[in-house]
């Protein structure tokens, strides 16, 4: 049987994903007790509204996140978000800047390339918001040249937050490659032999949105 691996952080009211962005809140519209009258004590239901920023938890960036005329979430083809063969890149042994040396000789065409830094171990602490691993501009350029379908990282940002030009976002999204940030559990994935599913809602005009990303690992 295949093995499923959770790759997303849970969304909890009050959680902080990125400095300066609002935290998610929940508004209960109908609770179990209040629903008794509506359904004449024959059934009970719970309905709530979740208020969140698109950049909450583990989320996917569409090209619209970087470009005014870029493809929005609803416009990303499912072939770039689901059933993608995964190539996991171990980036735990170097410094903060991840260059192309670890994947220069790999076939990445039509694959999801996930960069494992183990930075996700800091999730939920103040340390998560400083000194994050990131892709260099050259690494992003190499990913584009290799016709990568999807790029993910278990870090605060795929870019160096000290660089306002955001070269990785600029190059990857400019090439139509979705980005997934704040991933987790990448250490549970093999270098190859797994498939990724990371589909956001089909939000027309939306630029970013949380996903429940997961991998299916072939056990054969």
Model-derived regions, located:
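Active-/binding-site microenvironments in catalytic and ligand-binding cores
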Residues: 1-220
């Amino acid at each position: 049987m295949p093995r499923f691996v959770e790759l997303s952080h849970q969304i909890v009211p009050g959680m902080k994903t990125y400095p300066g962005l609002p935290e998610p809140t929940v508004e209960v519209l109908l609770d179990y007790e209040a629903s008794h009258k509506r359904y004449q004590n024959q059934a009970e239901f719970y309905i709530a509204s979740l208020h969140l920023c698109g950049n909450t938890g583990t989320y996917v960036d569409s090209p619209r996140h970087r470009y005014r005329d870029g493809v929005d979430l609803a416009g990303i083809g499912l072939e770039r978000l689901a059933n993608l063969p995964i190539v996991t890149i171990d980036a735990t042994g170097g410094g903060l800047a991840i260059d192309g040396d670890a994947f220069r000789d790999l076939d990445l065409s039509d694959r999801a390339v996930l960069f494992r830094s183990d930075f996700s171990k800091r999730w939920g602490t103040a340390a998560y918001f400083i000194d994050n691993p990131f892709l260099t501009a050259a690494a992003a350029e190499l990913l584009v040249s290799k016709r990568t379908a999807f790029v993910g990282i278990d870090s605060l940002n795929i870019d160096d937050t000290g660089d306002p030009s955001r070269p990785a976002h600029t190059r990857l999204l400019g090439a139509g490659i979705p980005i997934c940030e704040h991933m987790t559990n990448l250490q549970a994935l093999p270098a190859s032999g797994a498939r990724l599913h990371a589909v956001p809602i089909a939000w027309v005009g939306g630029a970013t949105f949380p996903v429940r990303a997961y991998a299916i690992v072939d056990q054969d």
